[in-house]
Swiss-Prot record:
Keywords: Developmental protein, DNA-binding, Gap protein, Metal-binding, Nucleus, Repeat, Zinc, Zinc-finger. GO terms for cellular component: nucleus. A zinc finger (C2H2-type) spans 1-5, 11-33, 39-56. InterPro entries: Znf-C2H2_CTCF, Znf_C2H2_sf, Znf_C2H2_type. It comes from the Eukaryota. This is Protein hunchback. Coiled coil: none annotated. It is found in: Nucleus. Gap class segmentation protein that controls development of head structures.
């Protein structure tokens, strides 16, 4: 938590200039570099990389 106050972002993406405070944020960001859409709507053909995109 303290890193948030000092601006330290030790976790860096190897594919772009993104950096963040914790590893879980980096893991989520790395999905943006893939073509995998693992979350699918049960009612239509919509698919997304992020599960929160399916929630109302």
């Amino acid at each position: 938590h303290v890193r948030n106050h000092f601006g330290s972002k030790p976790h860096k993406c190897g594919k772009c200039n993104y950096s963040c405070v914790n590893k879980s944020m980096l893991n989520s960001h790395m999905k943006s570099h893939t073509n995998v859409y693992q979350y699918r709507c049960a009612d239509c053909t919509y698919a997304t990389k992020y599960c929160h995109s399916l929630k109302l």
